[in-house]
């Protein structure tokens, strides 16, 4: 009889411990999911959104990102296209050379910046940086003109202290810090793009691991690697600017 009671008590404690472990795991999952969605954006921060004038992303993706970004800036060439989607930005930035203003009662601020040494995207980023933004999401920055796409990617090197994420329908790209970790699923594809010459790159939980290796545009890149198992992927490097897609 005593052994039966001991067994029941032991079973009760096992059930309680299991429940606590489940709660802990759920909490961790929510935490990492939040990190995965916002890419370095700390709790309480609100990133801005820039809509460039490249190929449109899906309306679903656009509206989802807008939920994270209460302040929306459009480049002048994208303004009319946004209005056709019934999306009205808070601000339009550019040299206004390609601006067509549709009839609307929505209040939108227009700022003309004629500096021809910077692209309209750089003008928008510079404006947000001056306003104190440290986290910026960008859509419609790829596709259409190849020169614009390449410039928008290389442009990340100009803002090493700003957390900029470039989205399209298929992927997202951002510069990672010298020590980076994030939860991925087994089989997820990961590409490492050296915006500048990167040294001492070491990875964990990738099918093709790097161990204190170098990546450089035109010589060697780290495209189409694969996550080995569901869990945390770790990447470290000691110099340069390394982006992940």
Regions found by a protein language model. Give the residues of each.
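Acidic/Gly/His-enriched mid-domain segments of enzyme catalytic cores or analogous surface patches
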Residues: 68, 77-161, 167
